[in-house]
Amino acid sequence: MSRRNTAKKTKRTEKSDPIYQSRLVNMVLNRIIKHGKKSLAYRILYRAMKQIQQKTEKNPLLVLRQAIKEVTPRLIVKSRRKSGSTYQVPFEIKPNQGKILAIRWLLEASRKRLGPNMESKFSSELIDATKGKGKAIRKKEETHKMAEANRAFADYL
């Protein structure tokens, strides 16, 4: 059976959202979704962006990008077993994976935050992240500290 004329797979691209035309906003949106309720996720995200606009008087898309950039980790630690012992081995991660982790940490931190609704908690967490504060920033620093402490095991890949 010849493989010469097989169909080429096209690379899947993420769509951009209708208002901001940003793939990053769409990535955040898809991580907000719970139980398939995309319209609720849209409402939460767009209201949070509106609150950011009112609080900071800056472009909310720039604030979102800055917050994700501040929270994005460069290193993570993974458990590896070697001769009966488990080591926390630091790994460098790809930029896209770091971005995904940053979005996840921002959402986790905003869900744990005290506040009346998800929109205000998420907008506050994003604003804090741009200022270098907040639980998501603390999570990144904690991860980097753990990677630095276990740097001796970096060759146990």
Swiss-Prot record:
HAMAP family: Ribosomal_uS7_B. Part of the 30S ribosomal subunit. GO terms for biological process: translation. GO terms for molecular function: rRNA binding; structural constituent of ribosome. This is Small ribosomal subunit protein uS7cz/uS7cy. The lineage of its organism: Eukaryota, Viridiplantae, Streptophyta, Embryophyta, Tracheophyta. It comes from Welwitschia mirabilis (Tree tumbo). Its main location: plastid. CDD domains: uS7_Chloroplast. One of the primary rRNA binding proteins, it binds directly to 16S rRNA where it nucleates assembly of the head domain of the 30S subunit. Belongs to the universal ribosomal protein uS7 family. It is found in: Plastid, Chloroplast. Keywords: Chloroplast, Plastid, Ribonucleoprotein, Ribosomal protein, RNA-binding, rRNA-binding. GO terms for cellular component: chloroplast; small ribosomal subunit. The keyword Transmembrane helix does not apply. InterPro entries: Ribosomal_uS7, Ribosomal_uS7_bac/org-type, Ribosomal_uS7_CS, Ribosomal_uS7_dom, Ribosomal_uS7_dom_sf. The keyword ATP-binding does not apply. It comes from the Eukaryota.
